[in-house]
């Protein structure tokens, strides 16, 4: 009886050992894959494809791996001809998030001729639409080149007012640069003047790093001079990311915390191949770069 008991115990122990070994093997196979980096796309990058096949284009953007999108198709309370909630659903159903959109209404020329009743009604509609779409940011993509310092100051005052309205709705107002902002008006650099004369609590700057370089300036110098003002960065190159050698992406990313950057948005305006090839190549460039962190949210 004792022998049978010992034999049974031995069999049970061996079985337990084998079962445990199998479980350990399974656990090794179930180690989660490396977390995906947070990389967003400005949908202007696929502007013609969106016109031809909106749903198919969004699906391809998601398949590449992008975390979310910034819209470039706002008009009269709609995004790409859809109600804000429908636009949001189309992006979220694809597994991405809606971060922001480019929109804006310029002042009259001269600014004193602006119809303020119509202007504020336009902004009320735009702000509500961005809020309903679940966006965090509303970004002004462009202004006419100011002819005088008074024109430039009028835009700074205007953006402070719009930014206050955005804050009240739970949004943040941003301004996206090109290269003309790095010219002077009456002895003042346009970009610097805007940074100095807008309220950081009401207006952030979506720095387009490529256009800064084309304007003869270094993005990191601005991060040092205006820390915390650049909450969203437009990551762009002359063609696909990393091809021109003109943009020091590693230095930009290494100083992202100084900039105050929380989100990085890829924009590809010109391509060597198709737009889809271009946005995939640009995504892969960042996703494979050791200097790019998984997330820049604090």
Short names for language-model regions:
Residues 46-52, 71-83, 105-120, 144-153, ...:
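Acidic-and-aromatic substrate-binding clefts and catalytic sites of carbohydrate-active enzymes
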Residues 37-42, 69-71, 98-103, 138-140, ...:
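Hydrophobic faces of well-ordered beta-strands that scaffold small-molecule active sites
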Residues 109-204, 276, 296-297:
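Active-site acidic/histidine proton-transfer and metal-coordination neighborhood
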Residues 255-256, 269-298:
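Aromatic-rich peripheral "rim/lid" segments of glycoside hydrolase catalytic domains that contact
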